[in-house]
């Protein structure tokens, strides 16, 4: 709230209100375009957490992800370069494949990146990567927030007409997201593992993808101050998963607190 709790002051009988900062709300809109990014970062969670929350999904462990970044022409490149640099360090040496010329000396002094565009491969099964993730001060939800913001810079690809239309408070209509190839950050490949075999994320069923995304968001962002708004989160789930969705929500929610959810659904199972 705006006001802090009143402390006990035996020497003062006055009632005082002490102001305190109100936390800034964090609004995240998660759709299937950012599903791969969120699911990839589940690889930063402990192995046991994924076993507990998604025990009925065989290929629930992210094994390897290839993230493509492209800071060419980005006005905020200097701010985002720090996140890319940390990502390259996390992946380890020789895990970044350049897709642009080497940066000039002035560019390197500003950004500290050898290349403005490249593919970063993170192997979640590599013991050294696991060690670096454990030593890293950033939590998975903080990684997602940083990379999600970088992904949002793709709106710069909107046409001038679309940008002008969005400035009007009365605007009503549909705006297409920029193509994946024009985003400053995108997931090129994501492979999932059952502990022995690996498959591409696209080979998972729609229901498995939906359960990984919806419960993954709860596991990463759920706390006492979080409210999830779900619009038919069960569309691709089988009847058993639909019936138990509220129990799975609570299970994913145990790690951080007591997040709440408002769900719209036509399903009698849910």
Could you say what each language-model-derived stretch is?
Residues 1, 182-270:
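Secondary-structure-rich domain cores
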Residues 6-209, 216-227:
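Extended helical coiled-coil dimerization/tether regions that scaffold
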């Amino acid at each position: 709230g705006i006001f802090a709790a009143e402390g006990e002051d035996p020497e003062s009988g006055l009632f005082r209100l002490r102001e305190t900062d109100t936390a800034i709300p964090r609004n995240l809109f998660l759709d299937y375009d950012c599903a791969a990014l969120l699911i990839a970062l589940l690889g930063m969670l402990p192995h046991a957490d994924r076993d507990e929350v998604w025990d009925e999904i065989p290929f629930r462990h992210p094994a390897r992800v290839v993230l493509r970044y492209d800071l060419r022409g980005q006005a905020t490149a200097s701010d985002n370069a720090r996140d890319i640099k940390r990502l390259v360090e996390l992946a380890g040496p020789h895990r970044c494949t350049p897709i642009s010329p080497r940066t000039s000396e002035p560019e390197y002094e500003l950004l500290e990146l050898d290349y403005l565009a490249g593919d970063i491969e993170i192997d979640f099964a590599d013991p050294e990567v696991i060690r670096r993730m454990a030593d890293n001060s950033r939590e998975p939800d903080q990684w997602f927030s940083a990379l999600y913001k970088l992904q949002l810079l793709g709106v710069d690809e909107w046409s001038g007409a679309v940008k002008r239309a969005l400035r009007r408070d009365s605007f009503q209509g549909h705006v297409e997201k920029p193509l994946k190839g024009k985003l400053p950050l995108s997931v090129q490949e994501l492979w999932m593992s059952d502990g022995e075999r690996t498959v591409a994320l696209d080979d998972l069923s729609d229901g498995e993808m939906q359960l990984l995304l919806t419960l993954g968001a709860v596991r990463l962002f759920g706390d006492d101050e979080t409210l999830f708004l779900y619009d038919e989160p069960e569309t691709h789930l089988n009847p058993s998963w639909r019936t138990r969705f509220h129990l799975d929500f609570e299970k994913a929610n145990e790690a951080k607190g007591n997040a709440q959810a408002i769900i719209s659904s036509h399903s009698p199972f849910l």
